[in-house]
Swiss-Prot record:
It comes from Methanocaldococcus jannaschii (strain ATCC 43067 / DSM 2661 / JAL-1 / JCM 10045 / NBRC 100440). The keyword Transcription regulation applies. Gene3D superfamilies: 3.30.70.920, Winged helix-like DNA-binding domain superfamily/Winged helix DNA-binding domain. Homotetramer. The lineage of its organism: Archaea, Methanobacteriati, Methanobacteriota, Methanomada group, Methanococci. This is HTH-type transcriptional regulator Ptr2. GO terms for molecular function: sequence-specific DNA binding. The gene is ptr2.
Amino acid sequence: MDEKDLKIIEILMRDGRKSYTDIARELGTSESSIRKRVKKLEEEGVIKGYTAIIDPSKIGYNVVALTGFDTEPDKFLNVAKELCKFPEVKKVFTSTGDHMIMTEIWAKDGKEFSDLIFNKIGKIEGIKKICPAIILEQMK
């Protein structure tokens, strides 16, 4: 991977819909060169896919929470896998720091979020502590 690949990645991270022609023009190279480089980055797993960035509130999700989970050590991976099964859990990360597992959870409202945490997720075997932090405003 060279400097040009890194610039292509940076451009696609800003706008995943940007055409190869526009990227080539911006970097002063040919469209076919960009096409080959992007294909190689995809094959190597550097580019894993393309997605839309959604404003949860515009589609009815008024509660977004970053939620930390502490687990029994021997249940750690099982808890992470179980969390992945919930459609409301949009992202699951294993981490160091304050919590063993961090998630991003979307809910329609506080009642739905509470029900999810206490009556569904909270019943996963091995969870010792749940620490939700509701997002007030996304700055970036």
